[in-house]
Amino acid sequence: GRFGGKYVPETLMHALTELENAFHALATDDEFQKELDGILKDYVGRESPLYFAERLTEHYKRADGTGPLIYLKREDLNHRGAHKINNAVAQALLAKRLGKQRIIAETGAGQHGVATATVCARFGLQCIIYMGAQDMERQALNVFRMKLLGAEVRAVHSGTATLKDATSEAIRDWVTNVETTHYILGSVAGPHPYPMMVREFHKVIGKETRRQAMHKWGGKPDVLVACVGGGSNAMGLFHEFVEDQDVRLIGVEAAGHGVDTDKHAATLTKGQVGVLHGSMSYLLQDDDGQVIEPHSISAGLDYPGVGPEHSFLKDIGRAEYDSVTDQEALDAFKRVSRLEGIIPALETSHALAYLEKLCPTLPDGVRVVLNCSGRGDKDVHTASKYLDV
């Protein structure tokens, strides 16, 4: 569709073309695929389990004992505790093939930064992470983790000092050092080929899910649910099933204080089409087309744009997008911790919170697979300020 593209300075066009060519070459390179699969298995710990959430399923049963069956795709069990590592590992290998020794990345919650620092340590690459000063405060432990792993973390003070500003700063660095540097973008956003590339490196989530579902119950999931910030974990789960018209795809955005306030990050629910960070997509913008600062209790969903492919899936009606508030996410954070002994990331908690709306509408025995995109260790401090336990 009209989404995506390469709205970037001339200096980056060559790098993007080089990247795209390298990506296509490696996609059919058995040696590269073998190396990547080996690392995903032995270092990341794939495949991740498809787990039947028995007590959560019980919780959503109606009075007559009917209700959906809820499964969690356990990306929180990957090395470093989130889906982010899938993409980081693959892009680091790609950078090595391109002969680039210097890696830069942007990070919001710090998860992508930690994943990038992790793979740079693993492959012996120089690592510079751009992070908004405000996010550095919110996620001090992740800042320490990145430094511990040998990365240099650069604070970004411009704008609201959050993810959007960190991304702009990382792009600036890349323009200046494009010959020596590979930019590991952490979501399905940014200029082509990034959205496609990041999706391809995460589609292992959906591929495993199809195989595991077939093994567990001899069919497909009926409904897929995932949280959406930029949208990489959702795209990783959805992509495999886009052609399966009988599988519902549901993305859950951050409604912050509510979608009718000015404090939310529900881009697909409330945004208009515009250009940010090199690609055309839905964006949160004011009447003058200026990007509005998003808000979410979850630093990883706090982004004013969204991946172009999600914008496309929304427009053609293939995927549905809804949103849940900070409070609903916090309630789910506690609920799932209590019911399943799984402390989910606040990002993931948005998807889990949506079960409150979704489950009452589903027929008996419908199989829901929810992408448990990350673990909540990083969010316990934030949650402790709001939750009474």
Curated annotation (Swiss-Prot):
Fetch the Gene3D superfamilies from UniProt: 3.40.50.1100
| One annotated Gene Ontology cellular component of this protein | chloroplast
- As recorded in UniProt, its EC number(s) are 4.2.1.20
What is the uppermost EC class here? lyase
Positions where N6-(pyridoxal phosphate)lysine occurs in the chain: 84
Where does the source fall among the domains of life? Eukaryota
- What SUPFAM superfamilies does the annotation carry? Tryptophan synthase beta subunit-like PLP-dependent enzymes
Pathway(s) per entry: Amino-acid biosynthesis; L-tryptophan biosynthesis; L-tryptophan from chorismate: step 5/5
Give the record's GO biological process terms: L-tryptophan biosynthetic process
Enzymatic reactions: (1S,2R)-1-C-(indol-3-yl)glycerol 3-phosphate + L-serine = D-glyceraldehyde 3-phosphate + L-tryptophan + H2O
**A Pfam cross-reference name:** PALP
Q: Does the keyword section mention Translocase?
A: no
Q: Which GO terms describe its molecular function?
A: tryptophan synthase activity
- Ribosomal protein found in the keyword field: no
Similarity remark: Belongs to the TrpB family.
Q: How the protein assembles, per its UniProt entry?
A: Tetramer of two alpha and two beta chains.
Q: Please name the PANTHER family in this protein's record.
A: TRYPTOPHAN SYNTHASE, TRYPTOPHAN SYNTHASE-RELATED
Give a short account of what the protein does: The beta subunit is responsible for the synthesis of L-tryptophan from indole and L-serine.
Q: What is this protein called?
A: Tryptophan synthase beta chain 1
Q: Which organism is it from?
A: Zea mays
